[in-house]
């Protein structure tokens, strides 16, 4: 008879952490599924002040990518730097991450999808630019925080937790990197024509490569950089 493997206290904690992150994001997705169309209509309504629209959009974004890992950090008394937000290897992580995104960037140009380089641009950005320079700067920092920092850092933290829970002695494979990459791909529109398959391949290379770089450098700034200046910019 096969004996049941007994989990260590650390493994149990990591399982709880993953459940917290998953359930938090799921709860926000459920809310979005119920009232998402109304929220989108509200956020796109230029007759309403840009600030409440930005706040609503940022709240939903943070709920999906950021709230769960923040709860885990508070619960475990962990700091963000403990997950790789540090100076050491930061340039190496950023440089290597950029290389991982090169095939994806080439795909954007070759497929004719390039419409301009617009980092930190979301649906309320045009109205934000009409509010004056100071307000634009503040709003842009908010966008950078929720659509750049937290989205990129969210990948790093989840990857870190999965890798600690399911460690693999491999240089180029990581359960955390694989799961996070598939998660990122599944939550974006897909098609299965030639261009769709090329997009799938280049997206996989970009995200998986980014997280393998994180695994080797133990520096999360590459992930953050990618989501501020590449992923949400083209």
Predicted regions and their residues:
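Aromatic-anchored segments of alpha-helical transmembrane domains
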Residues: 26-35, 101-109, 180-190, 228-234
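Alpha-helical transmembrane segments in multi-pass membrane proteins
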Residues: 14-76, 96
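Short, Lys/Arg-rich, polar N-terminal cytosolic tail immediately upstream
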Residues: 1-13
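Cytoplasmic membrane-interface regions of multi-pass membrane proteins
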Residues: 2-5, 74-85, 160
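Juxtamembrane helix-loop-helix connectors linking adjacent transmembrane helices
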Residues: 42-55, 80-150, 164, 169
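Structural signal for the C-terminal ends of transmembrane alpha-helices
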Residues: 34-35, 71-80, 166, 213-217
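Transmembrane helix-loop-helix hairpins at the membrane interface
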Residues: 136-234
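Residue-level signature of transmembrane alpha-helical entry/exit and packing/kink sites
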Residues: 14-22, 53-61, 92-97, 136, ...
